[in-house]
Amino acid sequence: MKKIMEYLQHYINQYPHRLALVFEDRHLTYGELSKEIYQASMRYKEVKLNKKVGLMDEHPVNNIINYFAVHQRGGIPCIFNHQWSNERIYQLVKSYDIQWLIKDNHLTSNHDNSIYNDEVIPRNVIHIGFTSGTTGLPKAFYRNEHSWIVSFKENEKLLQHCEETIVAPGPLSHSLSLYACIYALSTGKTFIGQKNFNPLSLMRLINQLNKATAIFVVPTMVQQLISTQRHCSSIKSILSSGAKLTLQQFQQIRNLYPQANLIEFFGTSEASFISYNFNQSSPANSVGKLFPHVETRLLNQDDDAVGLLAVRSEMVFSGYVGQSNQEGAWIKTGDFAYIKNQHLFLVGRESDRIIVGGINVYPTAIESLIMDIEGIDEALVIGIPHAKFGEIAILLYSGKVQLNYRQIKFF
């Protein structure tokens, strides 16, 4: 039995009447969740050990129930986005040999001649996730149980208010929301989610429960929460993963939620958590302090010690489906970075680098500086061909101020 199943069963036995899942239209206690999982597992008796099962129900509660039910059958849940087209689902099923699909509590077989008959499944896999690229077919990857258990422990160290409720309003097909949900249920907490992100409705749910709360969000959600101007004293920790928040956003959060700690994470679906910034205590341009036991390498460093970031830790994934995976391998993030005093500084994506007269220019670094100018709403740096320099960088911005070349150069 997987450890997450053991953890869940412990809290089912200890606190059967405690709320486990809260969505706008569905609330389940730990006891009720247990019954739902058992009933679902009885419907899926055909699922065998290590067989892949696509979860594609429109309601996230059903997908959570089915996630654990598939585990009870020894299968591997595959986390689909219910908004994917039928064509995309068909391509994923064929490409990654997903033998079963579950939708509306119905198990459908997709058995066919598999290109992965001889595939070696990594140890202790808890699910298959998919990268969220905007083009092409999402890449399937294995998430192992140990990596998340280690991550849970690191999270517990950062929560300082004995939080009883974990909130993640994003779709469960996104690693952050699924992680937060399994984290909550593995530690006996209440999980609040949403079918579609609605900040006002979310505030009402949190206020109704009135428990110390940690909320896992991405920066666009942070901005929408700020826009509501709704104070919520129950929110004790805000954990943001994605783009670095601006100083202005941080100050707005402090004004709206003065009792809350803001913890910014840098990481990827593959590498999990790499660094964290607690209440913006790290240097201004960094993405935080490296987590303990995260090893780093900077490949192909230039004269400024900037190189391509690769990481290794107990929190990383177990590789892509269908590719040979080596335990303990280094994970390349695709970011140019440097490290100073255990703090990580990102200067740009490998694919975005502009070379101006032989000098590396990193648009992300420039955009970050421009966004710190008061009155700037958005900033974008692009490269265009140039006869003399090969490329030059062009800044596009919007806001209430007008910038000039000398001002930017001085800044």
From Swiss-Prot:
InterPro entries: AMP-bd_C_sf, AMP-binding_CS, AMP-dep_synth/lig_dom, ANL_N_sf. Pfam families: AMP-binding. Its EC number is 6.2.1.-. It is an enzyme of class 6 (ligase). GO terms for biological process: fatty acid metabolic process. Keywords: Fatty acid metabolism, Ligase, Lipid metabolism. GO terms for molecular function: medium-chain fatty acid-CoA ligase activity. The keyword Lipid metabolism applies. PANTHER family: ACYL-COA SYNTHETASE (PTHR43201), MEDIUM-CHAIN ACYL-COA LIGASE ACSF2, MITOCHONDRIAL (PTHR43201:SF5). Belongs to the ATP-dependent AMP-binding enzyme family. This is Putative long chain fatty acid-CoA ligase VraA. The gene is vraA.
